[in-house]
From Swiss-Prot:
It comes from Drosophila grimshawi. It is found in: Cytoplasm. One of its GO terms (cellular component) is eukaryotic 48S preinitiation complex. This is Eukaryotic translation initiation factor 3 subunit L. Keywords: Cytoplasm, Initiation factor, Protein biosynthesis. Component of the eukaryotic translation initiation factor 3 (eIF-3) complex, which is involved in protein synthesis of a specialized repertoire of mRNAs and, together with other initiation factors, stimulates binding of mRNA and methionyl-tRNAi to the 40S ribosome. The eIF-3 complex specifically targets and initiates translation of a subset of mRNAs involved in cell proliferation. GO terms for biological process: formation of cytoplasmic translation initiation complex. The keyword Transport does not apply. The keyword Transcription regulation does not apply.
Amino acid sequence: MYGGEDFNNTQQDFYDDYAHTGDPALDLEYERNYYANRMPENVKYFLINFCQAIKEGNLYDIQNMYENTFPQISDHHFDKSAWPEEQEVGAIVDNDKVFLILYKELYYRHIHARIPGGPKLDQRINSFFNYCDFFNLIISAQNPVLLELPDIWLWELVDEFVYQFQNFAQYRARLTDKSQDEIQQLCVNHSNVWSILCILNVLHSLVDISNIKKQLEAISQGIDPQTVAGDFGKLAFYKMLGYFSLVGLLRVHSLLGDYYQAIKVLEPIEIHKKSAYSHIPACQISTSYYVGFAYMMMRRYADAIRTFSDILLYIQRTKQLYSTRSYQNDQINKQAEQMYHLLAICLVLHPQCIDESIQQVLREKNYHDAMFKMQCGDLEVFKSFFVFACPRFVSPCPPVADAPLEDYVKDPMEHQLLVFMDEVRQQKDLPTTRSYLKLYTTLPLTKLASFIDPNANEDDVSKLLIRLLCFKHKMRNLVWSKGPSGLEGTFKSGSELDFYIDDDMIHIADTKVSHRYGDFFVRKIMKFNDLNRKLKNINI
C-alpha cells in the first residue's frame, strides 16, 4: 500500500507544497503561503483587514466587520463548518497574539452556534483557556491594555462567556452519553474547567478593576465618574466590560437560583431607570428578563410586572434597532415570548392594571385562555408556562467521577419548579375568594363559607379565616419605590380590594384604579394621523 514508487511520489508532492529549509524566516514564508493558498481569497482579505483594524483601534471598521462582514462570510463559507484554525490564521496575520485570542473567541462561539451536534470536549476546554488568556491579558497587566472594541462585541463576549459556562455545566451533568474516559477527563483531569469559582472570579475581577460600582454611585450623586474611575476605569473598554460583568453576575446567580444575590449585584444600577450604559438592546432586555424572573421567584410580583411591562414596551418601540441582525432578532424574540409567559403568571397571581398595548398582545396571542385556566387552579398550565419561560438552571457542583450514570441536567430545574409550584398551590384558591369578595361591601363569614362550600360547618368557617389571612398575606408585597437597590421597598397591598373582619362580618373596600382611557385614545388618534399623512404622500 505504501511501498516503493507511490509513497515516494506522495512524499515529494507534499514537500513541493510545504517545504522546510531550516531557515526560520523562509519556513515562516512557506507556512504563510501554504495556508493562504488553502483559504478563500475573501476570507483571507477579511482576516488581514480585521487584524489591521484592531491594531489601529479603528472602531468604525471593527464594528462593521464584526456585525456585518463576519456573519455574511459565516453564512456563505462556514454555515455548518468551523472557521479556519488558529495555525492557518496565524500564518497570514504574523501570529498577532491579541488578534488570535479575539479570533478564537469568535471561532469557538461560531462552533457553539452553528456546528451540528455542538462542540467536542476538547473544543469546550480550549475555549475556556482562550477566555482565560484574554482575561489574564487585560486584568493582570500592570498598566491598562490599549485595546478598543465596540460595545456590542464586549457585551456579546461577556454574555457568551456565561452562556458557555451554562452549556458546559449541562454537558457535564449528562453522564448517560459519555464513556468512562470522558467522565475521567471531566471530573478529574479538567475539574476546574468552567468551574463556578472561575466564572465568579473573572466577573468580579472585571467589576473591581473598572471601578464601575464607584462610577455608577458617582453618577447617581451628580459627581464626575472620572474622578473615581482609576487608570483602568477611565478607558471605555474596561468601563463597559465592568458594566456588562455586573449583568453577567446577575445571570450567573439567577442560573444558580440565588435570586437575592442576583438583584444585589446590580445595586449600583438603578434598574427601573434608563442609563447611559443601557444602549445595547440585547443587554437591556437580558437584564430585565433576569431581574423580572428573580422578582417573581422572590414573590415580588408588582416589581416583576413593572419590569416585564417596561421592557416589553421597549421591545415594541425599538424593534427596528436589532431586526437587521437575524441571530440577535431570534434571541430577543424568544426572550420576549418568555417574558410574556412570565408576565401572564404574575398577573394571575397578582392581578393589576398594565399598559393597554401589552394587554392587546396578550389578547392577540391567546394568553387569556391560559390565564383563565390558571385562575381556575389548573396547575399543569402553571407548570408548562414556567418550564418554557424560566432560565436553564445549573448546579454549582458537578457530578463526581463515581456517580451513577444518570442524566443530572434536569435536577436544578426540577428543584426550582418544585419551589415555584409550592407557592402556586398556596395561592390556588385565592382567585375564587377574590371573585366573591368583589361582589359585596359587607359579607358575613358564614355566608362566604356557604358560597365556597354549600355544606359548610363551623370548622369550615375557621378554615375560611385561615384562607382570608392567606389572601391578606399573599396580596401584600414588598414594592420598590426609589433608591439604587432593587432589594429596597415598602410593603403595599396589590389587590384591587381590601377588607377587614369585625366580629363575624367582612367589610370590603374596592381600591381598583379606573383605566385611563384618554391616554389610549390619544395614542390611537396620533397613530391614525401618522398613517393618514403617509397615505397622502403616496403617489399612485
